[in-house]
Amino acid sequence: MVIVEDSNSGYEFFSEVSKEKTFEVVSAKGKSNIFKKINEYEKNKILIIADGAAFGAEMDGIVKKIRENNSIAMYLPESFEWLILKSDLINSNKVKNILEEPSDYVESKDYMSWERFFTALLVEETKDTYLRYSKSNLNSAYKNEKIMNKILKEVPEELLD
């Protein structure tokens, strides 16, 4: 069982991945609902995938739950958009430089979170390409097996087995 925080593109992506695997994907429909979803599926082996950039306040209760139940694991990339940027799908020195030192580029007066910054960066870098990104609806290019595998290289392999 994979519980994703996201109900948009990240959820669509991991749902597509699950078609080739032996796990089910459900959306928590927001970080504040993850704990409820864990309780709903706690008899299963669970992987939680959530945006580390925005997870903060929800962490304490979930960490306690993980300590009580060793069949729960957590993967917290900065955001789904960060995963895509990190995958090298976008061959850009600008993106590589930003990913090396994001704090040098993220301006807090412009972006409420790193997730929003990485979303804006991904949208900008893909706007006139076949990889055009929209947070609300995953472009079918990201459902291509080669592209999915490239993105999944950023996810620890043992988590998705």
Regions inferred by a protein language model and the residue ranges of each:
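Acidic, divalent-metal-binding catalytic cores of TOPRIM
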Residues: 1-161
